[in-house]
């Protein structure tokens, strides 16, 4: 269905708003993917907080114009699906994981921190743990010595309690 000028302006405004908040954009070619598979991909993206959109490349170029993602415009050819997120790794992770199980979805490029990423860089970005995972690992590492110390004190107190009970 063709979009009229007002619809196109609305789409560009919506995508521009998402791009303004984003730290990463990943694009993938979706040629030949079924509607059911695309629906599953959208659901996975929604769960991870990724804005996923099939968009005409001309409209996408206009949306990234004047942003740190402007250099990505050269990569926008063919039928593409755009993953946009504030989380640096989420779009790469969602699209890469889905592409592993569906050969019809092919990663094409990405952009992070104003730099255009090739396919290998997008795949590498997808392997990085998310911010929440890193924070939980850091918390675990910080808590481990404290909990070990607390267990040692508890064992020492129990041992002294046994010694006093035997002396009485």
Swiss-Prot record:
PROSITE patterns: RIBOSOMAL_L10. GO terms for biological process: translation. InterPro entries: Ribosomal_uL10, Ribosomal_uL10-like_sf, Ribosomal_uL10_bac, Ribosomal_uL10_bac_type, Ribosomal_uL10_CS_bac. Keywords: Ribonucleoprotein, Ribosomal protein, RNA-binding, rRNA-binding. One of its GO terms (molecular function) is structural constituent of ribosome. GO terms for cellular component: large ribosomal subunit. Gene3D superfamilies: 3.30.70.1730, 6.10.250.290. Belongs to the universal ribosomal protein uL10 family. Part of the ribosomal stalk of the 50S ribosomal subunit. The N-terminus interacts with L11 and the large rRNA to form the base of the stalk. The C-terminus forms an elongated spine to which L12 dimers bind in a sequential fashion forming a multimeric L10(L12)X complex. Forms part of the ribosomal stalk, playing a central role in the interaction of the ribosome with GTP-bound translation factors. NCBIfam families: PRK00099.1-1. This is Large ribosomal subunit protein uL10. It comes from Ralstonia pickettii (strain 12J). The lineage of its organism: Bacteria, Pseudomonadati, Pseudomonadota, Betaproteobacteria, Burkholderiales. The gene is rplJ.
């Amino acid at each position: 269905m063709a979009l009229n000028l007002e619809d196109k302006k609305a789409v560009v405004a919506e995508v521009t708003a998402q791009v303004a908040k984003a730290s990463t954009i990943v694009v993938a070619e979706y040629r030949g993917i079924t509607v059911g598979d695309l629906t599953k991909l959208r659901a996975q993206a929604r769960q991870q907080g990724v804005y996923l959109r099939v968009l005409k490349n001309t409209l996408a170029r206009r949306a990234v114009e004047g942003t740190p993602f402007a250099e990505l415009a050269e990569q926008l050819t063919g039928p593409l699906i755009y993953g946009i997120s504030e989380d640096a790794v989420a779009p790469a992770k969602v699209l890469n994981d889905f592409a592993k199980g569906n050969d019809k979805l092919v990663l094409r490029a990405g952009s992070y921190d104003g730099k255009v990423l090739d396919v290998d860089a997008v795949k590498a970005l997808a392997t990085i743990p998310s911010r929440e995972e890193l924070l939980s690992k850091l918390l675990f590492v910080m808590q481990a010595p404290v909990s070990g110390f607390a267990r040692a004190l508890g064992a020492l107190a129990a041992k002294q309690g046994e010694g006093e009970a035997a002396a009485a």
